[in-house]
């Protein structure tokens, strides 16, 4: 069987992982095995966190829209149904920004939604 020489590749891999583990406490930043486990775990947490961030922001936008809509006498679900019926195609992020920064414009949107629900 032929001899496999892989020192350069292994060193490159180890250096890459140890560089990623810089700043970790104790042996986690100095030995390849511990650093590798910690880096893989950290990358997994980062991956999951990127998915959770999308959910968290959507929940925040809905809570803001709901609060602003209720201040104008309409629940979130009725407000969203009303603007859909009115043909206003605006995402929740934009609606929440309008609710925070321009209360008069949001009140106008609520009035449009109310008219569509009553029609």
UniProtKB/Swiss-Prot annotation:
Q: Name one Pfam family in it.
A: Ribosomal_L20
- Record-linked Gene3D superfamilies: 6.10.160.10, Ribosomal protein L20
InterPro entries referenced in this protein's UniProt entry, alphabetically: Ribosomal_bL20 (IPR005813), RIBOSOMAL_L20_CS (IPR049946), Ribosomal_protein_bL20_C (IPR035566)
Q: Which UniProt keyword terms apply here?
A: Ribonucleoprotein, Ribosomal protein, RNA-binding, rRNA-binding
Got a GO cellular component term for this one? ribosome
What GO biological process term is on the record, naming one? ribosomal large subunit assembly
Which GO molecular function terms does the record list? Answer: rRNA binding; structural constituent of ribosome
Q: Which residues form a coiled coil?
A: none
Q: Does the keyword Ribonucleoprotein apply?
A: yes
Function per UniProt: Binds directly to 23S ribosomal RNA and is necessary for the in vitro assembly process of the 50S ribosomal subunit. It is not involved in the protein synthesizing functions of that subunit.
Q: Which HAMAP family match?
A: Ribosomal_bL20
The record's section on NCBIfam families has: rplT_bact (TIGR01032)
Q: What's this protein's family per the entry?
A: Belongs to the bacterial ribosomal protein bL20 family.
Protein's name in the database? Large ribosomal subunit protein bL20
């Amino acid at each position: 069987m032929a001899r496999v020489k892989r020192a350069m590749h292994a060193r490159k891999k180890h250096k890459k992982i140890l560089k990623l583990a810089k700043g970790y406490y104790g042996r986690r930043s100095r030995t390849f095995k511990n650093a590798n486990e910690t880096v893989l775990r950290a990358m997994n947490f980062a991956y999951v966190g990127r998915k959770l961030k999308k959910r968290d922001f959507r929940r925040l936008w809905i809570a803001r829209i709901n609060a602003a809509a209720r201040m104008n006498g309409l629940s979130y679900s009725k407000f969203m149904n009303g603007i859909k019926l009115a043909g206003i195609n605006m995402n929740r992020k934009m609606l929440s920004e309008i609710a925070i920064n321009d209360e008069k414009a949001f009140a106008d949107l609520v009035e449009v939604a109310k008219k569509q629900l009553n029609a």
